[in-house]
Amino acid sequence: MGSGKSTALEAFERLGALTLSADEVVHSLYEQQHVVDQLVDRWGAVVAPAGAVDRAALARLAFADEQQRAWLEGLIWPLVAAQVAAFREGSLVHTPRPPAAVVETPLLFEAGMEGIYDATIAVIANEELRRERAAGRGHEALDERNARQLSQQQKADRATYVVINDGTTAELEAELALILERLAE
């Protein structure tokens, strides 16, 4: 969180890549009735007052302990993986052919989804900058969320490419353009 994954995704789109945000996929899943029904069955109407998922309430309940989080991930991650697979298939027949199809997947390695991609990119940034960015977006609980994720170094060690995003958006986009050229080869 706060490393610049969403900014990187926007840059890839400007550079001509097809893009998909796994976060947006998750948000759309929370609007599907079969998902809402399962969430309400698990945690009660508090997670979906008036039929719409309250993501803050869901987060409080789902991340209260490991079993609750694992249950939610078991529900959501396979659905996300299916939509990512459909996106990938669509990208293969897209006209004109894009230089790459890029999926922003915040918990890529934690979800064990890295194997479905041809390459992975870890976008990392210094901790203080990440805190500033996260706070600017209303995400104050960076330490709590980070505790449930691999460290930036672990992600960098597992990624095909590593982008250090401590500079400007223009610098980030220039670095991503170089990666996009390599991916298009």
Please name every model-derived segment:
Residues S3:
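ATP-binding Walker
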Residues S6:
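Walker A/P-loop
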Residues E13-A22:
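Post-Walker A helix-loop "phosphate-sensing" segment adjacent to the P-loop in P-loop NTPases
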Residues L15, V36-V40, A81, E127-A135:
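An amphipathic alpha-helix signature
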Residues D23, L72, V102, V163, ...:
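Residue-level signal for inorganic ion chemistry
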Residues E24-A100:
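ATP-dependent small-molecule kinase phosphotransfer cores
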Residues Q83-V84, G115-I116, E127, R133-E185:
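Small-molecule kinase domains that catalyze NTP-dependent phosphoryl transfer to phosphate-bearing small molecules
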Residues A85-A135:
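ATP-dependent NMP and nucleoside kinases share a basic, alpha-helical "lid"
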